Amino acid sequence: MRTFTPKPGDINRRWLVIDAEDVVLGRLASQTAILLRGKHKATYAPHVDGGDYVIIVNAAKVALTGSKRDQKVAYRHSGYPGGLKATSYVDLLEQNPEKAVEKAIRGMIPKNSLGRQVLSKLKVYAGAEHPHAAQQPEAYTIHQVAQ
């Protein structure tokens, strides 16, 4: 039996909106990565971008369990010697909560050209409003154990 490869006509992309208020960041990121890659679909193929578009709202109200909000640090490097920058998640969630959510999801997506294509379908907003009403997104809820 040959490997099934979905053709462009076989791929049915939906627009989903996820409310991140009081959702644990890691659980949000893993569920979103699955939706973006299309692993929840029967037509999944690892070499084809068949995932859905995902809009995340209320990124500023995402939850971090334990003492991660105070102790977890996000690193980035400029590429120059001595260019390592460190930002605590307290500061990151205050200044740019979209980046905190995008960084968590980016870590769960492949680091190649297909991963970059998949990440282009992710839209993250700090507040409750988003400019994608014309796409008629469906609500998607993240089910999690009470924290």
Swiss-Prot record:
SUPFAM superfamilies: Ribosomal protein L13. GO terms for cellular component: cytosolic large ribosomal subunit. This protein is one of the early assembly proteins of the 50S ribosomal subunit, although it is not seen to bind rRNA by itself. It is important during the early stages of 50S assembly. The gene is rplM. Belongs to the universal ribosomal protein uL13 family. Part of the 50S ribosomal subunit. NCBIfam families: rplM_bact. GO terms for molecular function: mRNA binding; structural constituent of ribosome. It comes from the Bacteria. One of its GO terms (biological process) is negative regulation of translation. Transmembrane segments: none annotated. InterPro entries: Ribosomal_uL13, Ribosomal_uL13_bac-type, Ribosomal_uL13_CS, Ribosomal_uL13_sf. PROSITE patterns: RIBOSOMAL_L13. This is Large ribosomal subunit protein uL13. Pfam families: Ribosomal_L13 (PF00572). Keywords: Ribonucleoprotein, Ribosomal protein.
